């Protein structure tokens, strides 16, 4: 940042910057400029110290709606997945995503959150092995019944934890060993009375996510075998309406 340009500003302009940064308002411009410059330098040092904690090794998967996920390594050699966000991602939204993923991870259905930063906009978590879609390819394009049971188990636990995931994209399911996890809580919401009233069910993961996933699998022309167990959790009305 070019701090010299700040000196070209008027007292009133400098005062407005100081107010926006919650800094002390001083009687002369020079003192306020020192405070502003010091605050910016502290911020830059903070960002550098956080970014230096992790070395980006490679991109994981495709670029998402909100940003990119990387494989990162710490100085001690530990490897994690870092989900980065665009600058527009608000701190409150990022914190909400962290909170809901932590709630899910405590139940063993989502990657554990290792670290996060609302300034540099990232969440660091345990890295997974492979996507469900990659596993499906090796299985002849189908989801095994045992894997469908894991998905339903995930949905039930999320409902119990009052966390509505909200995105049934098959890309949001990953394995660590043989254990299936759900990832990307960017669209997740807390299950509240207002949400229950809006969606018409107190178990939206079972009743909405299951339908969403089955429809995605049908759209991908997957064998009915891939959702034979899943569709047992759909209502008769849902099955008739969507020809499942």
Kindly label every feature range from the protein language model.
Residues 160-175:
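Catalytic-loop of the protein kinase fold
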Residues 58-59, 63-98:
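ATP-binding glycine-rich loop module of kinase domains
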Residues 84-116, 146, 191:
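A conserved alpha-helical element in kinase catalytic cores
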Residues 38-59:
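Juxta-kinase regulatory segment immediately upstream of eukaryotic protein kinase catalytic domains
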Residues 176-244:
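C-lobe/activation-segment region of protein kinase-like
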């Amino acid at each position: 940042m070019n701090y010299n340009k700040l000196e070209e500003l008027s007292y009133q302009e400098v005062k407005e910057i100081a107010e926006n940064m919650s800094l002390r308002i001083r009687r002369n411009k020079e003192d306020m400029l020192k405070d502003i410059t010091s605050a910016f330098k502290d911020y830059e040092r903070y960002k550098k110290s956080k970014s230096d904690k992790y070395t980006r090794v490679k991109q994981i998967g495709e670029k998402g709606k909100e940003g990119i996920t990387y494989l990162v390594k710490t100085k001690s050699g530990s490897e994690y997945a870092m989900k980065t966000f665009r600058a527009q991602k608000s701190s409150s939204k990022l914190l909400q995503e962290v909170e809901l993923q932590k709630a899910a991870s405590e139940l063993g259905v989502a990657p554990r959150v290792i670290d996060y930063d609302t300034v540099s906009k990232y969440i660091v978590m345990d890295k997974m092995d492979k996507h469900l879609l990659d596993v499906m390819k090796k299985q002849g394009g189908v989801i095994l019944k045992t894997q469908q049971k894991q998905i339903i188990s995930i949905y039930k636990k999320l409902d119990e934890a009052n966390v509505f995931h909200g995105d049934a994209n098959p890309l949001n399911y990953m394995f660590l060993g043989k254990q299936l996890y759900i990832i990307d809580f960017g669209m997740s919401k807390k299950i509240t009375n207002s949400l229950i009233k809006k969606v018409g069910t107190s178990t939206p993961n079972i009743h909405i996510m299951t339908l969403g996933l089955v429809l995605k699998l049908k759209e991908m022309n997957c064998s009915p075998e891939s959702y034979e167990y899943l569709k047992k959790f759909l209502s008769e009305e849902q099955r008739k309406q969507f020809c499942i």
